[in-house]
């Protein structure tokens, strides 16, 4: 009934569905536990002892303690809580399963404690390792690389609530050939991403879109404005690219992760006092609060962007277990709102979307993911042609430039 190619795709459907659902459940469990722990640390506990959660004492103390605890986990847990996200790419080969409990615990404590990183890198690492460990036993004919692709696709679908991001990302890596078309290669990853996104939607839906005025019609001047905004965002991101490896090397001369992360947490606390609670945590909920605020002005948006960018660099350089995409989206949104407040003639839809495109492009160096994040935060079909055009000079600016990553150090 089916062509042999179709039968091959159908055989991969079951493991793809299982991996997609499992990837989402791991993410949901981690986020739920972190959310409950966050409410306890930042609401119930300070209220019970009569301290305001946004007081300088509480912010500095909580983030310093978070750094010390994460440092203890990294030093003493088996596998040292997995690889350092500042060194490893988002998608990499499986790590030892023995490192996963420490990595998951370090992620949850970091998220709950207010560290300015997202969950994407540790969750990706955990899901890839679990998929390779269990999948190789259940389906031994499927290679470790295939499990890595399926787990990363399922995780991307779960993280962003849609399989579109996974389809875009893997369309550039799983290229077709004369014998195997690209969509044959995409079938199983897209199935995993769809299963991951649908499972996530049963429990919660990630809120990326901001309440920004509709963009009516593209004009030539808007293309120039968008390119300038993206260039400004890239310039800001390249400051982080320059700082991260140098700060990472400086901090890791101390050798002791408890000391490194304790110092990192203390600095994050100081930055949190300067920027306020909006600059804490992974940034998605805080981005919504920032966009809905009626009291923030251009200076406030500038402060939020600068503090969050500094916090992102400090958190990554210290070795906290977390990802950099979600904070980059917050920084881009704050930068875009600041630029619109300065030059109201440029629509906020352009400044916000193009700033996010530029920042995410610096962080990920992935054009499709950058376009996707800009489009979901400002969901306006009229913007898509403009974003595609603005991507071209932005990509030229970053061609050959160093990545937002630290260098490996000899122990």
From Swiss-Prot:
Similarity comment: Belongs to the chloride channel (TC 2.A.49) family.
Keyword Ligase: no
One GO CC term, this protein: plasma membrane
GO molecular function terms attached to this record: chloride transmembrane transporter activity; monoatomic ion channel activity
Segments passing through the bilayer: 9-31, 57-74, 95-117, 148-170, 186-208, 223-245, 258-280, 295-317, 322-341, 345-363, 376-398
Keywords: Cell membrane, Ion channel, Ion transport, Membrane, Transmembrane, Transmembrane helix, Transport
Chief subcellular location: membrane
Subcellular location: Cell membrane
UniProt protein name: Putative ion-transport protein YfeO
Stored InterPro entries: Chloride_channel_YfeO, Cl-channel_core, ClC, ClC-type_chloride_channel
Bilayer topology annotation: Multi-pass membrane protein
HAMAP family for the chain: CLC_YfeO
Organism: Salmonella typhimurium (strain LT2 / SGSC1412 / ATCC 700720)
